[in-house]
């Protein structure tokens, strides 16, 4: 008699939980959030509702705690309540699907874990696990209900199937029926049977959160129905689901050790880049800094890169250009021109190569470290592995795929075998990994920059051999590196004295608050235990420090005038500068073309200069990428002559270990000397007009690569003046885009200023902005007009648009 009483009590608790969940969903009298979400779900033909745990916790804390700690019963009751609620809104839609599903998001507290901290205390609980997807199985159909017809008896048999990956408490028999009780054969009615999609993925803990010197942990995850194919290898995800153990059998007996899986109910893609939080004050400081240091901003930023390393100024400039990158172009015919910059450092031991790599790991938004001995070719690109349980082939992502849109730092590059080095050729130029193995044909994105460090062939650099003999790498690989620097350990008493003074000051420096004998922690990152960042407002309130506080012991007495930028300011400045996509001007393009031909002929002009890497057509793209990166440092919309000159200087130093002297401009052969003298005295604009006029008279065809005069001119940035009342006035720009008249632009600016005033904020979301400017407006603005006007104002540095949020500068 005890068992039926327990069952009746459990059913009563289940009905009570279902009623409370139904009250939570039916919030029409409150705010109507979830009622509108359910209606949107029905209109989009979906069957999974995403519920924020924080909302449930506010309304019914007891029920939220029971759901978190007893996931199976809680989710079953929640899903039944959702089906009842959908039936009350739309009865016909509720009959279309067998089940409706609940997905969770919000703050999970101590249940927000990584694969390493996923322990037995989390069993049968709702957990949120974050990591990188390393393996993905194929999507297979899984039978939920089978229908069988018996021709002899004219009867139909129906059977449901559940296993330990389902929410039901007891799994059903896995035997597929072929005969009925009287041994009559059965025919499967596939049209009436129900199947669901089933996929298994493996996520691994993130490299920045894994402890040093230990193997990264991983966990298997079950994805069903609409969650399959949401992720691919290399994606950073947060998976919310139920943690469950499965018995493992050996020789027909169940062993005492269990394997664990996570049954997912929601998958959230994490951002590809770690985007810092910007406030209006931060943007104002960045803009002010770029204007006040417009002449020496490249020197200032490169000097602040790795300030603990003495010297190597050109290498720091190259690393700054690598962090910013060029502009990636994908042409209409499918050709991709990469914008990533690859750098190779070759030199004697103890010249701070590995320290530079380590600084990039701390500064870059995403960086994956590897070493030459500890990495294979498939470990860097991708591998096809076999699943131990099912025997299926799986695709496993390598380090370069995991570092998509980031930086891969390869130390001890010379210790890799030639076969492994050949595997990264495609990644360095095409930005993707193509796999054709074991019946799997796949293409994975690996758009990453490569920063590699290596030693010469003989351990130390031999001055009596050519650079190519010392490097010992094949030309096909060297040409894929944009810059190759040779770092020598030269014996110079003055330089040795400066380095020793610098290193000794570093060792004597002690951070504020450091106690005797205590080591400061390596990282001070705070883990956010929620699916969305709750500390955005508190981070915005912290004031951004532009410069580090001068310390005579750390920075030296002589360098008091040389201010060092703070790491946080550098990170935010690089992130803002990467948004710009500068365009080449005719002047810069001509200069790059001339210097490229000069570099190609340098071996014939001077035999005493030995180059470090071959000058190929890729060198021309290198010059364009470096010029674009230098223009990004200045936050310019166009690549000017000074950007091209800085790029040429970097390339010359990398190729010839010194900056070559500038040649005098050769006179044009096809022009008369008198005409040339007259042209040099005239302004550039008149000379161009005369050249165009001469072409028109001679009847030449139009040159498709001719740049317009507007691209040669540097755009004038208008600084908004601050009036007496404290509000910023936006000047009217006369240059309106096609389809947007000057009057409409003026009306838009006044409406935009009114929207910022009424919101009392420095930033407005795009949807709220559209609603505000078209409110009480007789002639509302269209989406195209708003986009064109915002582009004009962004070019004039009045506003900044990022992630569909408009910032007033």
Curated annotation (Swiss-Prot):
Family annotation (PROSITE patterns): MCM_1, MCM_2
Residues bound to ATP: 347-354
Basic and acidic residues: compositionally biased ranges: 696-705
Record flagged with keyword rRNA processing: no
Motif Arginine finger per UniProt: ranges: 479-482
CDD domains xrefs: MCM3 (cd17754)
Record localization: Nucleus; Chromosome
GO cellular component entries: CMG complex; MCM complex
Main location: nucleus
EC number: 3.6.4.12
InterPro entries to which the protein is assigned, alphabetical: AAA+_ATPase (IPR003593), MCM (IPR031327), Mcm3 (IPR008046), MCM_CS (IPR018525), MCM_dom (IPR001208), MCM_lid (IPR041562), MCM_N (IPR027925), MCM_OB (IPR033762)
A GO biological-process term: DNA replication initiation
Domain called MCM: residue spans: 297-504
Assembly and binders: Component of the mcm2-7 complex (RLF-M). The complex forms a toroidal hexameric ring with the proposed subunit order mcm2-mcm6-mcm4-mcm7-mcm3-mcm5. Component of the CMG helicase complex, composed of the mcm2-7 complex, the GINS complex and cdc45.
Annotated family: Belongs to the MCM family.
Name the UniProt record assigns to this protein: Zygotic DNA replication licensing factor mcm3
Organism from which the protein derives: Xenopus tropicalis (Western clawed frog)
């Amino acid at each position: 008699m005890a068992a039926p009483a327990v069952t009746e009590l459990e059913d009563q608790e289940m009905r009570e939980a279902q009623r409370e969940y139904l009250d939570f969903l039916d919030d029409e009298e409150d705010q109507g959030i979830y009622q509108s979400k359910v209606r949107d779900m029905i209109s989009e033909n979906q069957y999974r509702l995403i519920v924020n745990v924080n909302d449930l916790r506010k309304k019914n804390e007891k029920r939220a705690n029971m759901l978190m700690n007893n996931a199976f019963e809680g989710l079953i009751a929640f899903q039944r309540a959702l089906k009842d609620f959908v039936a009350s809104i739309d009865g016909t839609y509720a009959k279309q699907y067998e089940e409706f599903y609940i997905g969770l998001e919000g703050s999970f507290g101590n249940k927000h874990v990584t694969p390493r901290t996923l322990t037995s205390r989390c069993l049968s609980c709702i957990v949120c696990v974050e990591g990188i997807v390393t393996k993905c199985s194929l999507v297979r159909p899984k039978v939920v209900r089978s229908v069988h017809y018996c021709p002899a008896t004219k009867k139909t048999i129906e059977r449901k199937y559940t296993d330990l990956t389902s929410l039901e408490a007891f799994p059903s028999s896995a035997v597929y029926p072929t005969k009925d009780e009287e041994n009559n054969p059965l025919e499967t009615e596939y049209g009436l049977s129900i199947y669901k999609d089933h996929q298994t993925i493996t996520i691994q803990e993130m490299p920045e959160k894994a402890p040093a010197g230990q193997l990264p942990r991983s966990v298997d995850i079950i994805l069903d129905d609409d969650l399959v194919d949401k992720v691919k290898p290399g994606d950073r995800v947060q998976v919310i689901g139920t943690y469950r153990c499965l018995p493992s059998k050996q020789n027909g007996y169940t062993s005492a050790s269990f394997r664990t899986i996570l049954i997912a109910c929601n998958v959230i893609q994490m951002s590809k880049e770690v985007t810092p939080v910007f406030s209006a004050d931060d943007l104002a400081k960045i803009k002010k800094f770029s204007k006040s240091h417009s002449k020496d901003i490249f020197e200032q930023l490169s000097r602040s890169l790795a300030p603990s390393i003495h010297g190597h100024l050109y290498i720091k400039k190259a690393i700054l250009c690598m962090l910013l990158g060029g502009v990636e172009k994908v042409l209409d015919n499918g050709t991709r021109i990469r914008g990533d910059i690859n750098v190779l450092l070759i030199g004697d031991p103890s010249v701070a190569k590995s320290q530079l790599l380590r600084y990039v790991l701390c500064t870059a938004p995403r960086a994956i470290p590897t070493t030459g001995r500890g990495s294979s070719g498939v470990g860097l690109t991708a591998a096809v592995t076999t699943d131990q349980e099912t025997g299926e082939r799986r695709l496993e992502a390598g380090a370069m795929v995991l570092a998509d849109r980031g930086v891969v730092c390869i130390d001890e590059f010379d210790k890799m075998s030639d076969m492994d080095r050949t595997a990264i050729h495609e990644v360095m130029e095409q930005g993707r990994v193509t796999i054709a193995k074991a019946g799997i044909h796949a293409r994975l994105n690996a758009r990453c920059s490569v920063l590699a460090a290596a030693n010469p062939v003989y351990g130390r650099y031999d001055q009596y051999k050519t650079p190519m003999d010392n490097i010992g790498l094949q030309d096909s690989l060297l040409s894929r590196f944009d810059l190759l620097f040779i770092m020598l350990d030269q014996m110079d008493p003055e330089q040795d004295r400066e380095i020793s003074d610098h290193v000794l000051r570093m060792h004597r420096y002690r951070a504020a608050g450091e106690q005797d004998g205590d080591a400061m922690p390596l990282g001070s990152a705070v883990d956010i235990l929620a699916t969305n960042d709750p500390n955005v407002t508190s981070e915005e309130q912290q004031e951004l420090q532009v410069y580090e506080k001068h310390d005579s012991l750390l920075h030296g007495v002589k360098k008091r005038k040389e201010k060092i930028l703070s790491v946080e300011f550098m990170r935010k400045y690089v992130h803002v500068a990467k948004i710009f996509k500068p365009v080449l001007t005719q002047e810069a393009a001509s200069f790059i073309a001339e210097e490229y031909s000069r570099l190609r002929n340098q071996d014939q002009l001077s035999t005493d200069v030995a180059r470090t890497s071959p000058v190929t057509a890729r060198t021309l793209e290198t010059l364009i990428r470096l010029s674009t990166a230098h223009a990004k440092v200045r936050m310019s919309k166009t690549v000017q002559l000074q950007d091209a000159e800085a790029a040429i200087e970097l390339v010359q130093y990398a190729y010839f270990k010194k900056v070559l002297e500038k040649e005098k401009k050769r006179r044009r052969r096809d022009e008369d000397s008198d005409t040339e003298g007259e042209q040099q005295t005239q302004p550039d604009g008149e000379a161009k007009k005369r050249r165009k006029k001469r072409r028109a008279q001679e009847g030449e065809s139009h040159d498709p690569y001719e740049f317009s005069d507007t691209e040669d001119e540097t755009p004038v940035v208008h600084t908004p003046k601050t009036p007496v009342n404290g509000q910023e006035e936006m000047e009217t720009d006369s240059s309106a885009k096609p389809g947007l008249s000057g009057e409409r632009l003026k009306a838009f600016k006044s409406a935009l200023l009114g929207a910022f005033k009424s919101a009392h904020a420095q930033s407005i979301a795009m949807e709220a902005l559209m609603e505000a400017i078209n409110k009480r407006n007789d002639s509302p603005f269209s989406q195209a007009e708003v986009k064109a006007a915002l582009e004009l104002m962004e070019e004039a540095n009045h506003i900044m648009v990022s992630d569909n949020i408009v910032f007033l500068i």
